[in-house]
């Protein structure tokens, strides 16, 4: 399976993350999966006329293109011309190259939230007219249009995240190479379900604090960050706390609130990332699938039953009260 990777309007963070894939032999891993990387801006030597010839060959059908990966948002400005971002040496807007290559690719993959929805590049007034491949924020459309399907029959596969976990990208490419990826493997936002059917909350090491609604009050506190610190882990679709980053970490494990970076529009939440917006003292963003009345009732009951150990540790930066030592055997 031939893979062509292009970078558009973004920081390159998804590529940097990919280079941290949990393997000692990244090229060997791709080869074992039957993946040939035609070109990647950080991993390939080709440039100038050699690269342009490759892109022309892919676009014109002389080189088979199985998977087109696009990293970074698509810059349509000014006034829809795309001339804010010209591919070096061609004088042609990147959006025109992407349209032409997407039309002949068997599959198209948006790598990261910028390529999927517009992401950070589309923040605020969006003067660059940035959008995703098939979404403009949470609205279907984007550069290629809501009705786009690649030659393989699938819409754009949105491997969203800022940045993406290297495993999300590699697993997607491996599944495509093995012909084991179909429409049933996409969630309603066309994200791969193998990671999007989970919540960041799943596997969070702060779950005991969440269960008792023992909340952190400031950075470095051990407690749950949902109530006060802006954490959206109970709403964000990703497997960050079960897959982990570099085999051992995640945002919440590092003491940072989840900002739901796999979600369209995460870059403009309408409030500071580190604060939880509330109405009458109740967080506006309640856990996925949790009715407000039930959450309020559960929170009240949980707080009334909070052990002293959990309550004390929640607002400390280290364990101040250790679990009691008790016999667990029946006799």
Question: Where would I find each of the regions flagged by the language model?
Answer:
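Iron-sulfur-associated redox domains of electron-transfer enzymes in respiratory
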Residues: 1-241, 248, 264-271
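Mid-to-C-terminal functional-domain signal that highlights helix-capping/loop sites
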Residues: 149, 280-281, 331
